[in-house]
Amino acid sequence: MVSVAEIRQAQRAEGPATILAIGTANPANKVEQATYPDFYFKITNSEHKVELKEKFQRMCDKSMIKSRYMYLTEEILKENPSVCEYMAPSLDARQDMVVVEVPRLGKEAAVKAIKEWGQPKSKITHLIFCTTSGVDMPGADYQLTKLLGLRPYVKRYMMYQQGCFAGGTVLRLAKDLAENNKGARVLVVCSEVTAVTFRGPSDTHLDSLVGQALFGDGAAALIVGSDPVPEIEKPIFEMVWTAQTIAPDSEGAIDGHLREAGLTFHLLKDVPGIVSKNIDKALVEAFQPLNISDYNSIFWIAHPGGPAILDQVEQKLALKPEKMKATRDVLSEYGNMSSACVLFILDEMRKKSAQNGLKTTGEGLDWGVLFGFGPGLTIETVVLHSVAI
């Protein structure tokens, strides 16, 4: 008779969860930040709000973003004027867009990840899908399963409405699934489309305007599994430790509410200050067991909520400017893509590390950290170990 303990032992993987492939995708429509204020105020019939436009221009100039990608083209916005008005009932129009576009963009990223992985998609055992862009039943996980032609008995997990910290959440969940299920191969997809948050400007709600200056569309996909098959699967990063915490005294710092007018976005407190005040504690908890206290000796992937967050974290920890280079490069090229951002940065880092002839996927260093920040204020921490190139 086999004991429960023996069954349990047989079910578990031997080694740590590893990221085996990464794919990314963006809509075709590229938006230049320098000219975006003109477009935005014109398409929303707000050109008479001269002072507000100047304010928005300054927000865009300070954003450290050069370009973003958006599903919402001029044509789509002209066909859906309710989306352009500030707080006009428009949820139906927005939902009609995102229930199609979110899985479609997710599929684009997933196809690239599966190709890099090099294994048949029939070997995918689990699917995690994450989006803050709309809700539906059955969800985007189901739609993606159909679009990719995955097996009907893939174990799916759908995460809706998590916000900007969720790139860390999906890694934490994928790690637990991979390590507790021998042979598991987890497809992780984050897909974000700003059609839910786009709206015209308001004199009285400048936090909404901040979102209009920062958010972009993108999807990222990973394959995660333990015990890579030698000669076939090539690990990129190992996931060693994860944590999630709610920052003290931060309630209401970042809020999003799904309303008739779409997803509303609110910044109510000093978000960069809250993040920088709590980052030290998160790092000590993560790296004390490894005897690491010099945070310039690790590689960095931080959700780029905006440039002020990165500036304050750098200042607080006395980080060298190059530590946040991959993070800032992704912010500059794509804007804030919510949950997908940190996965884009992982991709950027491993590619640049190889191009620059460095010895590991983590900028030549062994250990690194990935941070997600978002509503709550919630902080996700993932300790990563790089792989030799």
Curated annotation (Swiss-Prot):
Pathway in which the depicted protein is active: Secondary metabolite biosynthesis; flavonoid biosynthesis
Bilayer-spanning residue ranges: none
EC number per UniProt: 2.3.1.74
The UniProt record lists the keyword Acyltransferase: yes
Gene Ontology MF: a single term: naringenin-chalcone synthase activity
Reaction catalysis annotation: (E)-4-coumaroyl-CoA + 3 malonyl-CoA + 3 H(+) = 2',4,4',6'-tetrahydroxychalcone + 3 CO2 + 4 CoA
Gene Ontology biological process terms from the UniProt entry: flavonoid biosynthetic process; polyketide biosynthetic process
Coiled-coil ranges (or none): none
InterPro entries referenced in this protein's UniProt entry, alphabetically: Chalcone/stilbene_synt_C, Chalcone/stilbene_synt_N, Chalcone/stilbene_synthase_AS, Polyketide_synthase_type-III, Thiolase-like
Listed Gene3D superfamilies: 3.40.47.10
SUPFAM superfamilies for this protein: Thiolase-like
Induction note: By wounding and Rhizobium infection.
Keyword Acyltransferase: yes
Keywords assigned by UniProt, alphabetized: Acyltransferase, Flavonoid biosynthesis, Transferase
Catalytic residues as annotated in Swiss-Prot or TrEMBL: C164
Similarity annotation: Belongs to the thiolase-like superfamily. Chalcone/stilbene synthases family.
Annotated function: The primary product of this enzyme is 4,2',4',6'-tetrahydroxychalcone (also termed naringenin-chalcone or chalcone) which can under specific conditions spontaneously isomerize into naringenin.
Protein name stated in the entry: Chalcone synthase 5
Origin species: Trifolium subterraneum
